[in-house]
Regions:
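GNAT-family acyltransferases
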Residues: 1-83, 108, 144-154
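Loop/helix-junction capping segments adjacent to catalytic residues or to phosphate/diphosphate-binding pockets
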Residues: 78, 95, 126
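Conserved acetyl-CoA-binding loop-helix of GNAT-fold acetyltransferases
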Residues: 85-88, 94-111, 129-134
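Conserved GNAT acetyl-CoA-binding A-motif
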Residues: 109-120
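Conserved beta-strand-loop-alpha-helix junction that forms the acyl-donor binding cleft
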Residues: 119-129
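Conserved catalytic-core motifs of GNAT/GCN5-like acyltransferases
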Residues: 120, 133-151
Length: 154
């Protein structure tokens, strides 16, 4: 389930880029509602932008990961986060799921008229770099330890 995946991220203290929640006061139904509102740009924190929260599952229905598609960039996202943040649960990494998740996220971006998507990763994350490059990422530069890549979505 999604809750089991969230618990795995918490237990392993693994980064869950593309998935945001408050573990202390978590209520699943409220999380769903907050994500629906965020897509419409409603009740989002200051300096956040409208975003679509996506989840990935395997064929058996096991939750695999998160992908957050920001529908526009602000100054912070232009420097650090980009249009898309993603992560795969720790027990399922190294199986190609991140590559497919990003591919599908880019298709959603295309449907939202995003022509070029900025996708970033830490200079310390070669696996994410490989995922971005496999999806057509073109390196632009590094800023504060964050590699920045542009992907033509058309």
């Amino acid at each position: 389930t999604v809750l089991e995946m969230m618990a795995e991220f918490e237990q392993t203290q693994s980064a869950h880029d593309g998935g945001f929640w408050n573990a202390n006061n978590f209520v699943y139904e409220e999380w769903i509602e907050e994500n629906l509102q965020a897509e419409a740009g409603l009740n989002i924190p200051e300096n956040w932008v409208p975003a679509i929260q996506l989840l990935s599952f395997d064929v058996a229905g096991q939750a695999l990961g998160f992908l957050n598609l920001r529908l526009r960039l602000n100054d912070y996202l232009l420097e650090n986060g980009g249009h898309i943040g993603y992560s795969i649960r720790p027990s399922e990494r190294g199986k190609g799921y991140a590559k497919e998740s990003l591919r599908q996220g880019l298709q959603v971006a295309k449907g939202k008229n995003i022509k070029r998507a900025l996708v970033t990763c830490s200079t310390e994350n070669p696996a994410s770099r490989a995922v971005i490059l496999a999806n057509g990422g073109v390196y632009e530069d590094v800023r504060n330890g964050t590699e920045r890549y542009w992907i033509d979505v058309d």
